[in-house]
A protein has these predicted regions:
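Positively charged n-region of N-terminal signal peptides that target proteins for export
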Residues: 1-4
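Aromatic-rich carbohydrate-binding modules that target alpha-glucans
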Residues: 24-74, 82-108
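Domain-scale selection of a single, long terminal region
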Residues: 6-10
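Bacterial Sec-type N-terminal signal peptides, specifically the leucine/valine-rich hydrophobic h-region
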Residues: 12-15
């Protein structure tokens, strides 16, 4: 019985860290980005598709934000959360000209 509870405790701890703070979903020629930003008042998405023009994200739940863009090719992106640049954990990164990095979206 102790082994069962130990296994369940380890599984619960492992699953607790699986909540993604950032992910995307592709729908034909568009991609929708989601960002978990608890307490944020404003989230903006900026990408290289249009020279980093701001795309205001909309609320998609209590602390989740979403924004959709056309996605036919690879592009770089980041978020601005309450006025501060935020680069989430991404599969692909690229250094920018300012000593930081941007996420890179690569169509699958």
């Amino acid at each position: 019985m102790k082994i069962f509870f130990l296994i369940m405790a380890v599984a619960a701890l492992g699953l607790g860290g699986c909540t993604a703070a950032h992910y995307y979903e592709r729908q034909s020629d568009r991609v929708t980005f989601y960002l978990q930003a608890p307490g944020a008042q404003q989230v903006v998405f900026a990408c290289s598709l249009d020279e980093y023009n701001p795309h205001p994200a909309g609320k998609a739940g209590d602390s989740r934000w979403k924004v959709s863009v056309t996605a036919g090719s690879e592009f770089r992106y980041f978020y601005i959360v309450d006025g501060a640049v935020y680069v989430p954990d991404c599969k692909f990164y690229e250094k920018d000209d300012f000593g930081s990095r941007n996420c890179v979206y690569v169509p699958e």
